[in-house]
């Protein structure tokens, strides 16, 4: 891996069992700490996504090969988590719509994973995509038959999933304009919208929109808000002044 200069290896069954248990216990701690639910991150080339991806997963045991095998790790994490937190605690799963490169997870495979997750009781699916901060340069590109959009990058993919499962579907990425969000809500089966960077830029954004000021948020989607000093917007002028005074 170029960033960390580390060489990956296939996890042993003991290591897999340890991670499954760790995910479940982390979710239980979240519940005990007062959180309303948890989201299992199975996208963006993190560990669970690597198990799902035929590009990264070259295993020859029960965790590799077929899609059924590649999704086994995720399903074990969900099942172990549900056992610890109970039926009344929401568990969401974030998935990659497509990895957008040859040999990676396809949208058809992701749709199959979504259907399986619904079958075992997931409370919601967050449909994202593997773009590693390049979304703005990929707007207008079509992959697996659908197009990355300027507002709500992956909502075309999310809309398809929403028509195939009954569990709520959430879209994430490139959501800065309330008019565009309302258009997506009114014209697709997507029920919820996830925002992060816009709220770092403007923490009271939702309140402003509710009060009638519908101007888009001052967020350049640059992802420079992830800094060594913490997560904060480096674009918003008011936030810069506040940070300088800290």
Regions found by a protein language model. Give the residues of each.
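Flavin-dependent oxidoreductase catalytic cores
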Residues: 1-246
